[in-house]
Amino acid sequence: ELKSEARIKGQDLSDYYGMWVHQIKTPIFALRLLLREEPEENRESGAQLFRIEQYVEMVLGYLRTEDMSADLKLTRCSLDRIIREQIHKYAGIFVSKKLSLSYEGTDAIVLTDEKWLGFVIGQILSNALKYTRTGGIEIWLEDERGNRVSENPNLKQNTAPGICNTAPATLVIADSGIGIQPEDLPRIFEKGYTGVNGREDNRATGIGLYLSRKILRKLGHEITVDSQVDKGTEVRMSLWKKDLEMY
């Protein structure tokens, strides 16, 4: 009985925050329209509003991951389209920070949930941009041998309807940022853990990577991170799982 009451209270709280997130989107959208009238004069205000939008999206993502089963839609998606949508979303930050972007594109098709994978790629890009002061970000695809690929027909091979039987491949997002301390690496996927970098940056929430791994595992994907202090960070997402049945 106590567990049931706690579950109901937890659901009520989740519903409340979900309603709050959806309601706050309306004034944010109105502000965005106002700022577009004089974009040059409102550039800094627009940047701050973008940060607010990202925090709101993170909260909404966190709430939805509590029960993703009803919100999952696995389809064969263009990985290139998903990546480019997120690049476009963060284009303003690339420009304002004068960071370079290297991405050649890919013809790969992935069996995934387009919205959720886009959310994860956005989180990784956001982190990379946040902790990169000079240089830039590079995005590429690797095959099962670790070789870079741009257009690989094997990645589009499918078997019977409802089955994805593609070659293993990994999406890599690398930056030239400040890197992650070695002692922090084993804990970066823990909920709320921010590490040394997070303690020096008040904007850190310790939620982005936690959500990213949780979502990717729900999709049958995996994520790993390699990093060197003052050299940068590489995030690898294995996006193909052989004989993954659609449901």
Task: Give the residues covered by each predicted segment.
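Short beta-strand/loop element within the Bergerat-fold HATPase_c
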Residues: 136-154, 162-166
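Acidic ATP/Mg2+-coordinating residue in the GHKL
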Residues: 175
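Short alpha-helical Gxxx[C/S/T] motif in the catalytic ATP-binding
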Residues: 208, 212
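Short helix-loop "hinge" at the ATP-lid/N-box region of the Bergerat-fold HATPase_c
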Residues: 128-129
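Short conserved segment of the HATPase_c
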Residues: 180-192
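Short conserved segments within the C-terminal catalytic ATPase subdomain
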Residues: 91-103
